[in-house]
Swiss-Prot record:
GO terms for molecular function: peptidyl-tRNA hydrolase activity; tRNA binding. The lineage of its organism: Bacteria, Pseudomonadati, Acidobacteriota, Terriglobia, Terriglobales. The active site is at 19 (proton acceptor). This is Peptidyl-tRNA hydrolase. It is found in: Cytoplasm. One of its GO terms (cellular component) is cytoplasm. Its EC number is 3.1.1.29. Pfam families: Pept_tRNA_hydro. It comes from Koribacter versatilis (strain Ellin345). GO terms for biological process: protein quality control for misfolded or incompletely synthesized proteins; rescue of stalled ribosome. The keyword Cytoplasm applies.
Length: 201
């Protein structure tokens, strides 16, 4: 069993914002594999299915971003899985170029409050994550306002491709492991972690 968690904020006002790309990625995965993410369980919307022959649970915590760890901790416990080996967390990253994908096996939160909440709840940085870049081309004066702003029409094609790439990264991880996924998607060197991301609530 693998747990695939997308991070975001619940509520229509946040649905199509950069900070909710984790939720949107889970929605894309669910669409591709015919999984219905509609059960309320462990403070999250969840759905069970099979991807590449692997039993999976897709989850979107409904706790608001900064409390994501509470939901993830409950899910890991209920599913009786090892969060360091059997979980993939998908989230937005303000330090990566817009629309890019990076697969990472461990590391700090890099300023992302949802990831920090998970690290705190599980007491480890050792879990697989797929990061979706949301860094704009212009210099930001207010990161919080930006990550919670509505996606612009001009950004949608890039976002659409990024969501497909995130779904493909999950498939590669489940079929071949994280190494091949990193080789495929981590094509450019990562910028240093700036801790510049500001999460909502």
């Amino acid at each position: 069993m693998k747990l695939i968690v997308g991070l975001g904020n619940p509520g229509m006002q946040y649905q199509f914002t950069p900070h909710n790309l984790g939720f949107l990625a889970v929605d894309r995965i669910a669409e591709k594999y015919g999984i219905r993410v509609a059960n309320r369980n462990c403070k999250a919307l969840t759905g069970r299915g099979v991807i590449e022959g692997v039993d999976v649970v897709l989850a979107k915590p409904e706790t608001y971003m900064n409390l994501s760890g509470a939901s993830v901790q409950e899910l890991v416990s209920e599913l009786e899985i090892d969060g360091t080996k059997d979980m993939i967390v998908i989230y937005d990253d303000l330090d990566l170029p817009y629309g890019s994908i990076r697969v990472r096996e461990r590391g700090s939160a890099g300023g992302h409050n949802g990831v920090q909440s998970i690290i705190g709840a599980l007491d480890t940085q050792e879990f697989l994550r797929i990061r979706i870049g949301i860094a704009p081309e212009f210099k930001l004066s207010d990161g919080a306002s930006y990550v919670l702003s509505q996606l612009k029409k001009s950004q949608l094609p890039v976002v659409d491709q990024a969501l497909d790439d995130a779904a493909e990264a999950v498939k590669v991880i489940l079929r071949e492991g994280p190494g091949p996924a990193m080789n495929r998607f981590n094509r450019k060197p990562e910028p240093p972690e700036s801790g510049g991301e500001v999460a909502a609530k």
